[in-house]
Amino acid sequence: MTHQTHAYHMVNPSPWPLTGALSALLMTSGLIMWFHFNSTTLLMLGLTTNMLTMYQWWRDIIRESTFQGHHTPSVQKGLRYGMILFIISEVLFFTGFFWAFYHSSLAPTPELGGCWPPTGIHPLNPLEVPLLNTSVLLASGVSITWAHHSLMEGNRNHMLQALFITIALGVYFTLLQASEYYEAPFTISDGVYGSTFFVATGFHGLHVIIGSTFLIVCFFRQLKFHFTSNHHFGFEAAAWYWHFVDVVWLFLYVSIYWWGS
């Protein structure tokens, strides 16, 4: 920064976008291999490459922001705009799944028996595990807000406690979702109901895992005193993302579990 006449961060060449793209290719190809040929080798390779990329990319960004001072107010403003645009793109991503669901359910075709849920499908009870999942995510939304307020007030211990509670609730949600999938009386191959249900709730579950990972990184960074009350965009971005995941779940619960059943 000492040799620059501007406040912007000129990023050094990095291999991580390339390895990240490679891991995405390996994971999507691996999913196809798993679905059609029952082989998980390519999927595991993709997941390993993805984990290594995440670790090293996060390490570089933490070095640049916390230790080298590259994240000036101007850079943070750009990162905020970037995160907002990313969340908007995610909203549009999930809109596609809701569109598919309502397109199929509002005017069910004769092939589905002219009714929704389709003939032969026994939907999950929305007042059992899905309602528990809803309360778990709403509670995690409260605890992440508590963590944010504690950080703003400089209360490190409360911030760590609240962040730990949020992570625990996120992991609990994932375990509940996995058990629900395991016990579901229908599969992803059971027509349009199975495919829209598992793709929409599955991608949301993936986002919960990503959000939990993001919060775990923030937890370890807070243990190392990386965040201050006026310089903590990494945590702020994780909190925004978590609230987004919360809101998407409410729409999923009302649409697919409650109305759709």
From Swiss-Prot:
Enzymatic reactions: 4 Fe(II)-[cytochrome c] + O2 + 8 H(+)(in) = 4 Fe(III)-[cytochrome c] + 2 H2O + 4 H(+)(out)
Sequence ranges on the Mitochondrial intermembrane membrane side: 35-40, 106-128, 184-190, 257-261
Mitochondrial matrix-side positions: 1-15, 67-72, 153-155, 224-232
Primary localization class, coarse: mitochondrion
Pfam families named among the record's database cross-references: COX3 (PF00510)
GO BP annotation list: mitochondrial electron transport, cytochrome c to oxygen; respiratory chain complex IV assembly
Transmembrane segments: 16-34, 41-66, 73-105, 129-152, 156-183, 191-223, 233-256
Domain of life: Eukaryota
EC number of this enzyme: 7.1.1.9
GO CC, alphabetical: mitochondrial inner membrane; respiratory chain complex IV
Membrane topology listed for this record: Multi-pass membrane protein
Statement: the UniProt record of this protein carries the keyword Lipoprotein: no
Gene3D superfamilies in alphabetical order: 1.10.287.70, Cytochrome c oxidase, subunit III, four-helix bundle
InterPro entries named in the record: Cyt_c/ubiquinol_Oxase_su3, Cyt_c_oxase_su3_dom, Cyt_c_oxidase-like_su3, Cyt_c_oxidase_su3-like_sf, Cyt_c_oxidase_su3_a-hlx
UniProt subcellular location: Mitochondrion inner membrane
Disulfide bonds: none
GO MF assignments: cytochrome-c oxidase activity
Principal EC category: translocase
Record function comment: Component of the cytochrome c oxidase, the last enzyme in the mitochondrial electron transport chain which drives oxidative phosphorylation. The respiratory chain contains 3 multisubunit complexes succinate dehydrogenase (complex II, CII), ubiquinol-cytochrome c oxidoreductase (cytochrome b-c1 complex, complex III, CIII) and cytochrome c oxidase (complex IV, CIV), that cooperate to transfer electrons derived from NADH and succinate to molecular oxygen, creating an electrochemical gradient over the inner membrane that drives transmembrane transport and the ATP synthase.
Family, per entry: Belongs to the cytochrome c oxidase subunit 3 family.
Subunit details: Component of the cytochrome c oxidase (complex IV, CIV), a multisubunit enzyme composed of 14 subunits. The complex is composed of a catalytic core of 3 subunits MT-CO1, MT-CO2 and MT-CO3, encoded in the mitochondrial DNA, and 11 supernumerary subunits COX4I, COX5A, COX5B, COX6A, COX6B, COX6C, COX7A, COX7B, COX7C, COX8 and NDUFA4, which are encoded in the nuclear genome.
Name of protein: Cytochrome c oxidase subunit 3
Organism: Pelea capreolus
Gene giving rise to this polypeptide: MT-CO3
